[in-house]
């Protein structure tokens, strides 16, 4: 089973596959080096980046993330404000304190992080980290960042990464999920709660979801109150703060019956801009799509009913179930299947979560998820200048609104759907694999080569 807490992970921007994953890999490697008794013998460490990690690594802060991971930091607890000074110190000195300062290695950044445009054989996001004692190799590990902050060591690639604990309802498809819900008289969130209770206590579950929502809510607050220009060569101005100012001050806008769309846009822009600035966000299921799920829950909170502990849990459990299906049966990596695996999956998850809160049946929840993905099929991942900004930020806003629409369409539907969620997941994966790699997070095609920086 893939837990909802595997799908929703607290980390930092701008990318789950290119920032969170590499930081996790760096931390995993240095922990392995220390536990093997090889740390103090290490003179220097070399990092090789391959494929999409190389081609968009600079714009996604992959190099920074790996350095911070080797230093002993995890995405969920790294002190964001201390990163720039630490990177400057390492760059200037050519020395890297690793394992929380337990040892210092030679690390001339420009020489020891090597960018290779070619891909490793198993996945588009590959990296190899090697520890050396002079000319002697002490330890070398190859990692793949497979989306959503998940990393897989090469020797474990292709193996199941499900939680090994036995759960009462072990589903592997939407069809199985719906049958289990129907037979046991459970909602999707109810079934997921039974599974989560096999892994942790109710108090831990509630506290975990409360923490996830708090980080999302904090991202909205920061994003809609922060002026300025986002980092990087594109000089993209923050838009959420100006939109918020219009929404709270203009009677004309506030009386517009469509103003709810502007609020949803503002929520999504706020979180996505925080992500682009390297702020604290939640993979949902990725950083590139991290604005959609919080925006839809914020919409429900403001315009439908104030959220509480129970509704927050129901939303994340239902959305997490859908995210798990994509993770098991397709991909949530833009480098593997294009943006349909990030924005498309987030839209599908948010539509499912909202339908759950609106009182939809399990079938309606799955239909909302299917509608949302059906109209994201073929969506390319072509970040301009390798930044998670254009088209990513605006795309979050558009698809947050689309998720609400998909939920409403599913709730109002009176005819039986002709396309199942399982079929659209299968189609998404096949479509992504058929895409030219120019459109899979390499910045070699699409908008990425049409928009001029500056």
From Swiss-Prot:
- What cofactors does the UniProt entry give for this protein? [4Fe-4S] cluster
Record Pfam families? SDH_alpha, SDH_beta
Please give the organism: Escherichia coli (strain K12)
**Keyword Lyase among record annotations:** yes
Q: What class of enzyme is it?
A: lyase
The keyword Iron belongs to this UniProt entry's keyword annotation = yes
InterPro entries (UniProt xref): ASB_dom_sf (IPR029009), Fe-S_L-Ser (IPR051318), Fe-S_L-Ser_mono (IPR004644), Ser_deHydtase-like_asu (IPR005130), Ser_deHydtase_bsu (IPR005131)
One example GO MF annotation = 4 iron, 4 sulfur cluster binding
Q: Which reaction does it catalyse?
A: L-serine = pyruvate + NH4(+)
Task: Say which family it is in.
Answer: Belongs to the iron-sulfur dependent L-serine dehydratase family.
Q: In which pathway does it act?
A: Amino-acid degradation; L-threonine degradation via propanoate pathway
The record's SUPFAM superfamilies line, in alphabetical order, gives: Serine metabolism enzymes domain
Give the EC number. 4.3.1.17
What protein does this entry describe? L-serine dehydratase TdcG
Gene3D superfamilies membership: D-3-phosphoglycerate dehydrogenase, domain 3
Give the co-factor note.
Binds 1 [4Fe-4S] cluster.
Q: PANTHER family recorded for this chain?
A: L-SERINE DEHYDRATASE, L-SERINE DEHYDRATASE TDCG
Q: Which domain of life is it from?
A: Bacteria
Q: Which key words are in the record?
A: 4Fe-4S, Gluconeogenesis, Iron, Iron-sulfur, Lyase, Metal-binding
């Amino acid at each position: 089973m893939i837990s909802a807490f595997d799908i929703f992970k607290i980390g930092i921007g701008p990318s789950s596959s290119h920032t969170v994953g590499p930081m996790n890999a760096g931390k995993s490697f240095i922990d392995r080096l220390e536990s093997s008794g090889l740390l103090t013998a290490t003179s220097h460490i070399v990092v090789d980046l391959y494929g999409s990690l190389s081609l968009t690594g600079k714009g996604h802060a992959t190099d920074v993330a790996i350095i911070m991971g080797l230093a002993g930091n995890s995405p969920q607890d790294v002190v964001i404000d201390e990163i720039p000074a630490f990177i400057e110190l390492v760059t200037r000195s050519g020395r890297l304190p690793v394992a929380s300062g337990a040892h210092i290695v030679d690390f001339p950044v420009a020489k020891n992080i090597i960018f290779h445009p070619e891909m490793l054989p198993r996945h588009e996001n590959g990296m190899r980290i090697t520890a050396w004692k002079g000319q002697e190799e002490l330890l070398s590990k190859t990692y793949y960042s497979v989306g959503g902050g998940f990393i897989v060591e090469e020797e474990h690639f292709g193996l199941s990464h499900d939680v090994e604990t036995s759960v009462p309802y072990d589903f592997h498809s939407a069809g199985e999920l719906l049958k289990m819900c129907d037979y046991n008289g459970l909602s999707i969130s109810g079934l997921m709660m039974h599974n989560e209770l096999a892994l942790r206590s109710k108090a831990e579950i509630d506290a975990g979801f409360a923490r996830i929502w708090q980080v999302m809510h904090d991202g909205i607050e920061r994003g809609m109150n922060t002026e300025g220009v986002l980092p990087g060569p594109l000089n993209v101005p923050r838009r959420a703060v100006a939109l918020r100012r219009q929404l709270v001050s203009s009677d004309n806008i506030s009386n517009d019956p469509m103003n709810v769309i502007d609020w949803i846009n503002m929520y999504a822009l706020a979180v996505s801009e925080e992500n682009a600035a390297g702020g604290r966000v939640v993979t949902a299921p990725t950083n590139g799509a991290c604005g959609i799920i919080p925006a839809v829950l914020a919409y429900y909170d403001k315009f439908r009913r104030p959220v509480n502990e129970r509704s927050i849990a129901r939303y994340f459990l239902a959305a997490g179930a859908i995210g798990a299906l994509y993770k098991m049966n397709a991909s949530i990596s833009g480098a593997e299947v294009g943006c349909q695996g990030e924005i498309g999956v987030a839209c599908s998850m948010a539509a499912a979560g909202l339908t759950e809160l609106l009182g939809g049946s399990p079938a309606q929840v799955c239909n909302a998820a299917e509608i949302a993905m059906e109209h994201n099929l073929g969506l390319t991942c072509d970040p301009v200048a390798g930044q998670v900004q254009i088209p990513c930020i605006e795309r979050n806003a558009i698809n947050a609104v689309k998720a609400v629409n998909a939920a409403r369409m599913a709730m109002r539907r009176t005819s039986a759907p002709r396309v199942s969620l399982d079929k659209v997941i299968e189609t998404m994966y096949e479509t992504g694999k058929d895409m030219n790699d120019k459109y899979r997070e390499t910045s070699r095609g699409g908008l990425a080569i049409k928009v001029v920086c500056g």
